[in-house]
Regions:
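Long, contiguous binding/interaction regions
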Residues: 9-35, 39-154
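Single conserved hydrophobic/aromatic residue that forms the stacking wall/gate
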Residues: 1-8
């Protein structure tokens, strides 16, 4: 929705803050509802002001504050990692990523594309570790979040 995009930009322009990441996905096609996950930083007062401003935007239905480190919240990012190199390098790269259960999306004699899902800092670390094994390209999502247990965020 153009109104929401403009409003989001205006909120951040007024606050003078940056968006670290933004993830948008339709969650209820029948009602035309999407979930937007915005990752930003700021003092508690700045975050509260951003929440208030976002809540005033039409057609925003609900605004919630999911704090990093909150054990009741699951945070994840997804990354696609392309590596170019010989079989030995690719196998070593897979071992580096093993704890994140990498999915091999594409594999040739000279390259491999992996998908991993992890916390932002874990992906940052893996990317650093993979440079010596031929990491040549990265595409990653912004963070997404969901509450644990039976609590529903509507």
């Amino acid at each position: 929705d153009d109104r929401l995009s403009r409003g989001l930009g205006d909120v951040y322009k007024r606050q003078g803050d940056n968006i670290e990441s933004l993830a948008v996905a339709e969650v209820d096609p029948k009602r035309g509802i999407s979930r937007i996950t915005i990752v930003t930083t700021g003092t508690p007062q700045v975050i509260e002001q951003i929440k208030l401003q976002l809540g005033k935007l039409v057609p925003v239905h609900k605004v919630a504050d999911f704090m990093r480190g909150d054990k009741k919240i699951i945070f994840k990012e997804m990354a696609l990692l392309k590596l170019v190199g010989n079989t030995s390098k690719r196998n070593k790269a897979l071992k580096v990523c093993k704890k994140f259960n990498p999915v091999v999306l594409d594999k040739t004699q000279k390259s491999v594309v992996l998908q991993i899902t992890a916390l932002r800092r874990e992906i940052d670390t893996v990317m650093g570790d993979l440079k010596k094994f031929g990491l040549v390209s990265v595409s990653r999502t912004g963070a997404v979040a969901m509450t644990r247990g039976s609590e529903i965020f509507k």
